[in-house]
From Swiss-Prot:
Places the protein is found: Cytoplasm
Positions bound to Mg(2+): D9, E58
GO molecular function, one term: holo-[acyl-carrier-protein] synthase activity
Family: Belongs to the P-Pant transferase superfamily. AcpS family.
Needed co-factor(s): Mg(2+)
Function: Transfers the 4'-phosphopantetheine moiety from coenzyme A to a Ser of acyl-carrier-protein.
Reactions that this protein is recorded to catalyse: apo-[ACP] + CoA = holo-[ACP] + adenosine 3',5'-bisphosphate + H(+)
Name the UniProt record assigns to this protein: Holo-[acyl-carrier-protein] synthase
CC annotations in GO: cytoplasm
HAMAP family (UniProt xref): AcpS (MF_00101)
Claim: Iron-sulfur is one of the keywords in the record: no
InterPro entries xrefs: 4-PPantetheinyl_Trfase_dom, 4-PPantetheinyl_Trfase_dom_sf, ACPS, Ppantetheine-prot_Trfase_dom
Length: 130
């Protein structure tokens, strides 16, 4: 396996929290029902957990875009919803892809790490391909 893309993203949690449920924002249709359910089940702010997932989605897009250096961008409409951040029973995150991005990255392995500290959420994504 070779690393073909790396992405990172930072999110201001207070700014994100103001917009996440506002009708007409990009965030309204971004998160899957599973992501919203997982965030609502957390003991702290749902917005805090969704902000980290937004950062992960953005990091995956940046890693994918970087893997396509010197190639035409291929960002399908609604791409954020096609990138779902799921966690196992111990809270370890993994990315599940659907739609066009799943087809583009069908042979790839995506590693993702999420964090939040204070008012900031962050994520890093690494894409490996054979």
């Amino acid at each position: 396996m070779a690393i073909v893309g790396v992405g990172i993203d930072l999110v201001s949690i207070p700014d994100f929290a103001e917009q996440v449920d506002r009708p007409g924002t990009v965030f309204a249709e971004t998160f899957t029902p599973g992501e919203r359910r997982d965030a609502a089940d957390k003991s702290s702010s749902a917005a805090r957990h969704l902000a980290a997932r937004w950062a992960a989605k953005e990091a995956v897009i940046k890693a994918w875009s970087g893997s396509r250096f010197a190639k035409r961008p291929a960002l399908p409409e609604g791409i954020h919803r096609d990138i779902e951040v799921v966690t196992d029973m111990w809270g370890r995150p993994k990315v599940r892809l659907t739609g066009d991005i799943a087809e583009h990255l069908r042979e790839a392995t995506i590693h993702v790490s999420l964090t939040h500290e204070g008012d900031t959420a962050a994520a890093v994504a690494v894409i490996e391909e054979p």
